[in-house]
């Protein structure tokens, strides 16, 4: 089982089902309950980026058409240029490169999920999280977004909606050809309940791997403690 802790500055808010009170980060960087107990005493601290998370769970084959050409320094520079050009064209209300993170608590671990949304903007009263992908593919032929790209945007959308108490949230997938600069967009909107269930299912899957990691670590540490060393120090 796991639960989500909202991260806001140096203070973490626990969702209603938790009964341990708010979590506070002290000057030493330790997480404490308001009662003064060390909350993370026996939890393994794990970290993963949003991109690595969704690629670990969903990736199937080549998602970015990363030929040697696409991985060249010139291609990476072109990708950065396209990102900035698209972000700059979206107007003053467009927030670019928004850092987002939260802590997901499992029985044996606390997992920090973090990354940067390419952009967040509001249109006609609706909020969208933008995920920009530059590539050499003919984007006009895309009939739907690449699944793992969509999952990345949905993770950011969930975190943003959670931390801002939003009832609905949208995602926009922006695909741009690096040579022609032709652009194609895909949009979806979700209720908070829909995107929360999606994220919960995602974390349930990753939680199996995280729990396995923690169990292996705990077994290894227990074995080390049982070793008899020939000399006392």
Identify the function of each model-found stretch:
Residues 2-4, 16, 23-126, 151:
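Metal-dependent nuclease catalytic cores that hydrolyze phosphodiester bonds in DNA/RNA
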Residues 43-48, 145-147, 231-233:
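Structural motif
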Residues 89, 93, 163, 206-209:
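Solvent-exposed amphipathic alpha-helical surface segments
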Residues 102-196:
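Mg2+/Mn2+-dependent nuclease catalytic core
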Residues 166-233:
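ATP-dependent helicase/translocase motor core
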């Amino acid at each position: 089982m796991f639960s989500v802790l909202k991260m806001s500055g140096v203070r973490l808010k626990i969702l209603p089902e938790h009964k341990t009170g708010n979590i506070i980060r002290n000057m030493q960087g330790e997480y404490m309950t308001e009662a003064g107990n060390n909350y993370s005493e026996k939890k393994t601290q794990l970290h993963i980026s949003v991109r690595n998370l969704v690629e670990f769970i969903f990736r199937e084959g080549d998602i970015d058409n990363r030929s040697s050409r696409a991985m060249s320094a010139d291609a990476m520079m072109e990708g950065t240029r396209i990102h900035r050009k698209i972000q700059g064209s979206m107007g003053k209300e467009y927030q670019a490169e928004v850092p987002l993170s939260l802590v997901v608590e499992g029985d044996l671990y606390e997992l920090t999920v973090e990354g940067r949304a390419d952009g967040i903007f509001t249109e006609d009263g609706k909020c969208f999280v933008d995920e920009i992908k530059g590539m050499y593919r003919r984007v006009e032929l895309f009939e739907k977004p690449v699944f793992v790209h969509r999952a990345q945007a949905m993770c950011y959308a969930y975190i943003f909606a959670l931390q801002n108490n939003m009832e609905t949230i949208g995602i926009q997938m922006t695909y741009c050809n690096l040579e022609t600069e032709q652009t194609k967009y895909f949009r979806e909107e979700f209720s908070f309940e829909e995107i929360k269930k999606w994220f919960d299912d995602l974390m349930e899957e990753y939680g199996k791997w995280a729990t396995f990691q923690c169990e292996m670590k705990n077994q290894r540490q227990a074995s080390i403690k049982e070793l008899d060393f020939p000399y006392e120090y």
